[in-house]
Amino acid sequence: MEEAKKDDSLSNVAEYSVSEISHALKRTIEDTFGHVRVRGEISGFRGAHSSGHCYFSLKDERARMEAVIWKTTFARLRFPPQEGLEVIATGRLTTFPGSSKYQIVIESLEPAGAGALMALLEERKRKLAAEGLFAESRKRPLPFMPHVIGVVTSPTGAVIRDIIHRITDRFPVHVVVWPVRVQGETTGAEVAAAISGFNALQPGGTIPRPDILIVARGGGSLEDLWGFNDEAVVRAAAASAIPLISAVGHETDWTLIDLAADRRAPTPTGAAEVAVPVKAELEANIARLSARLKGAISRCLDRRRQETRSLARALPSPDQLFALPRRRFDEAAGRLGRALQTSTQGKRLHLNAVRVSIATLDRRIAQARRDANQCGERLPLVYQGLVRHRRARFDRDAARVSPRVTLQRITTLGERLKIAIARKDRAVSLRVERARTVYEQAVRLAESLSYKSVLERGFALVRDGEDRPLKRASDVKPGETLRLQFADGNIGAISTGKSSNTNRKSAPAREPGKQGSLF
């Protein structure tokens, strides 16, 4: 009885074809789950198919799920899938009726956790470093004084206000901001496009081309700063023809753009300090250097002026220089007058000698006519010779005045001038030295001949009342007033008329047997 009831219930179950049940399952799964986020490890990824689509699996310890990324979605992914990478896939669940399998159609893909991000970051860092994008040889020096600064950042955050405020305080320059999103899936593409856009600007255009670029963002987590690790951003920074400063995050935050940039700043404010110097310090340095330059020029001019005065004192006076030429000119003028008189007399005698008759004049005229005819016949030949001579002389002059020859002559004359100046300096120095030696010898001779040196040895100079020196005792009269000049002063005296010489007392006789003095 029970078996009969069971058979009746089974006969009431709806009957489906394979296609019907497959499509019913497909609708049920798609309607029930819709969009889901699935965490798993990528397995079986071999790159994009020839059609541009990607097929692989997501797995964990107990299950596996097929996954597909369509061509249009794959081109928009922030990073490509990699074998063995743990990811979080967002997409729609669906089934494929032809094989009775369910799969996830992935619309976005992101690494699962900081560990996966760090692994992906290290892999991307090794790849780009192997291409030489982080090499120090690629980095360019920053301009000392940029006129225009391009900033790639969010136009509404505190970062751009801090940068502009710091630049205004240090050295106000023109700032051009390229607005981008600094967080999200489109960050990498927008930042790369901004760097390339600044480099595409032409000098002198409507928008000025920056002299330096600053890519800036405030601090954040690894996920927040992930857009600045994008491969497109790193390649754009490395290819930038404009020097680039990276100021992403705080001092402890590092991104791949920091390695590709020409300079890394710890903060956006630090990037502004690196980009421009302090105007007040520059003005102070310029003032100090200007004062030093003026002092050096003044000292140099004073030294040259003193040297010129010394040389001028050593040179002879104009009267001494022109004395001999003036005398020669006077002598030549006298000889010229006498020569003119002699020549006039000779011409007058010659004129008297040639006063002849009419016949003599006719003969001389005929002779002059014949000479003129001969000269007329020789004139074309002489003219041609003169033309050839002038042409040859012109060619020689043209060769001499060529730029190369002129430069050689200028160089030669410059060398001769240097040699002449050196010879002049040596001659002046030698003449000054000789004059100094003669002067010193004259001083020593005058000192040796002065009577004062004799007074120093204990002698005295006797003068009479009229201050005339007395040479003999006979010149002194009794009672005459005298003046005696010693080395240290003068005293007065009166002559007594008697000789002051007295006989010396003889030495007493010595007793016999005692030895006396030798003197």
Curated annotation (Swiss-Prot):
Keyword Hydrolase assigned: yes
Biological process, per Gene Ontology: DNA catabolic process
Record Pfam families: Exonuc_VII_L, tRNA_anti_2
Biased composition (Polar residues): 496-505
An MF annotation (GO) of this entry: nucleic acid binding
Enzyme Commission code(s) on record: 3.1.11.6
Region of interest: Disordered: 493-519
GO annotations of cellular component type: cytoplasm; exodeoxyribonuclease VII complex
Compartments where located: Cytoplasm
Annotated coiled-coil segments of the chain: none
Disulphide bridges: none
Catalytic activity: Exonucleolytic cleavage in either 5'- to 3'- or 3'- to 5'-direction to yield nucleoside 5'-phosphates
Record-linked InterPro entries: Exonuc_VII_L, Exonuc_VII_lsu_C, OB-fold_nuc-bd_dom
Main location: cytoplasm
Record key words, sorted: Cytoplasm, Exonuclease, Hydrolase, Nuclease
Chain's role: Bidirectionally degrades single-stranded DNA into large acid-insoluble oligonucleotides, which are then degraded further into small acid-soluble oligonucleotides.
Family to which the UniProt record says this protein belongs: Belongs to the XseA family.
Quaternary structure and interacting proteins, as annotated: Heterooligomer composed of large and small subunits.
NCBIfam families: xseA
UniProt-listed HAMAP family: Exonuc_7_L
Protein name per its UniProtKB record: Exodeoxyribonuclease 7 large subunit
Organism: Chelativorans sp. (strain BNC1)
